[in-house]
């Protein structure tokens, strides 16, 4: 699938420097391996580092804007498993959504869920961008919904005996 990428500031250098196997003049904005589901997003900070206090959030520029070349596909920004498990830094809203018609710079809100200050350094891998299909609903108002065995039970209801 075609994916156009626009780099901001010196982001092309940051991505090329952090990637492996990038040819001279290459940009490095690609999946790390042939079977990787996502593309790592990097902290394209103006300063060398940012400190995130316990429970605090920080908006981190990823230095790129994208244009997805397929209809019905959007970008989803997920936490990196190691960053969340080791440092407690996760995508603040759970998952970020990059609508296919959005053309601005991708920014990642990171939340420090740990009890200690965490440091984000320039060029660090902070999240991953995964392209996935989506469906738009054609909502139809109604007075009643169809019956199911579950009904309106929620919040752990299906696990009860």
Task: State each model region's role.
Residues 1-161:
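Non-catalytic terminal segments and appended small domains
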